Amino acid sequence: SGKYISWEDSCSYLQLQKYERCELAKALKKGGLADFKGYSLENWICTAFHESGYNTASTNYNPPDKSTDYGIFQINSRWWCNDYKTPRSKNTCNIDCKVLLGDDISPAIKCAKRVVSDPNGMGAWVAWKKYCKGKNLSQWTQGCKL
């Protein structure tokens, strides 16, 4: 007789790739991003939404410098991670870009902390400057039990 795989077993093979807003807020708070370098949790949720739609598997190629943005925060391979194909990659976070695409977002949080520690702060993210900076961001954590 054949072996049946239960629903629970089959789910363990699936990688969680797209977060819900409040679920992400909890994960980022747990990872220590709330008020890190003076940026509220709402800033991070807003940025993640506009960069990746809360999708950890998101990638975007940038033809001008042949770099790629990876993961929930769209961390760039020219400066922050190594994808082994971007010319003159600095790999400042000392991380393989592929790690930023997994369901464990702690490497992305760790690298985001490194990014925001630079003088540019969250200004490193175009989406933050365009959609989040100086805005009322209270709706990004509204209704979340944090």
Swiss-Prot record:
InterPro entries: Glyco_hydro_22, Glyco_hydro_22_CS, Glyco_hydro_22_lys, Lysozyme-like_dom_sf
Documented EC number(s): 3.2.1.17
CDD domains per record: LYZ_C (cd16897)
A Gene Ontology BP annotation from the UniProt entry: defense response to Gram-positive bacterium
Summary of pH dependence: Optimum pH is 6.0.
Active-site residues (renumbered): 51, 69
Signal peptide, first to last residue: 1-16
Enzyme class of the recorded protein, top EC level: hydrolase
Catalytic activity: Hydrolysis of (1->4)-beta-linkages between N-acetylmuramic acid and N-acetyl-D-glucosamine residues in a peptidoglycan and between N-acetyl-D-glucosamine residues in chitodextrins
Tissue: Expressed by the skin glands.
UniProt subcellular location: Secreted
Keyword Thylakoid on entry: no
GO molecular function, one term: lysozyme activity
GO cellular component annotations of the record: extracellular region
Top-level taxonomic group: Eukaryota
Keywords, ordered alphabetically: Antibiotic, Antimicrobial, Bacteriolytic enzyme, Disulfide bond, Glycosidase, Hydrolase, Secreted, Signal
Disulphide bonds in the chain: 22-144, 46-132, 81-97, 93-111
One Pfam family hit: Lys
Domain C-type lysozyme: start-end pairs: 17-146
Keyword Signal included in the entry's annotation: yes
UniProt temperature dependence: Stable from 20 degrees Celsius to 70 degrees Celsius. Activity decreases sharply above 70 degrees Celsius.
Function: Lysozymes have primarily a bacteriolytic function; those in tissues and body fluids are associated with the monocyte-macrophage system and enhance the activity of immunoagents. Has antibacterial activity against the Gram-positive bacterium S.aureus and against the Gram-negative bacterium E.coli with a MIC of 1 uM and 8 uM respectively. No antifungal activity against C.albicans.
Similarity field: Belongs to the glycosyl hydrolase 22 family.
Protein name: Lysozyme C
Species of the source: Bufo gargarizans andrewsi (Andrew's toad)
Taxon lineage: Eukaryota, Metazoa, Chordata, Craniata, Vertebrata
